[in-house]
Amino acid sequence: MALRLVFYYPWFPRNWTQLGSFPYANYHPTQGYYDSADTNVIKTHIRSIEYGGFDGVISSWWGIKSDEDQNFQRLLETTVSQSSPLKWCIYYEHEGDPTPPNADQIAGDLAYIQKQYADHPSYMKIDDRFVVFVYGSHTTGLDTVKKWIEASKKTKPYLVLKVFSNYRSCPQQPDAWHEYAPANPLIDQSPDGVTISPGFWKYGEQPRLTRDLAAWQRNVRLLAKRSKLKFHLVTTFNEHGEGTPIESCKEWQTPSLQGSYLDVLHNTRPIT
């Protein structure tokens, strides 16, 4: 059975303000412009993610002692306190930097993640190995794969790298692949997974993917039929700057209090 996972961003309130603009968002979350460290916000998000039928969450991570790192600990602890079955893993963002980290830097980060989080009951594991999703950039290629496999020899995480041209031809392969390109409504990376997005409207720009609830319903139904994949991925729960959230916003409120996009996920579970 495929794991239904959603990308999550624990970087607020910092990122409500960007490039001198507040709020740096086109939509209005029903919780307001919240603080990601607020336990009540985290509890509400956990309930919403559970309502959407998700098995786990891929949480943006920007390095040791970053806001996202400190909030990740809060996410794990609050999940346990709520007796939630949700599992969390890290989305390693620095691989997308103009100058990505080298193998030694990655190895150090993986050692930290393993020591700090991997044994937590709410951290995601596959085949008894802690899961790490890795972002990428236009420079990602064969050398990136080689670097990550070298860097992970000691810690042995379950690595899910971001795709690039001819990624299947790499002589060395990670455990799985994913795509993160939320301006596309559906991306098929079988047999690893399928990624769907509700829309993409970056603040200050024209929409690159206009929201269409009927199209979202069709894509969620299609996803539900693909149970033999490794992952069903959704971009995103709350990346407001790029206009990809599925969390409840004033623009799509519903009687469930969860919003139209989560309602569709709630009512369309994977077919076994």
Give the predicted meaning of each segment.
Residues 1-272:
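Glycan-processing catalytic domains of CAZymes
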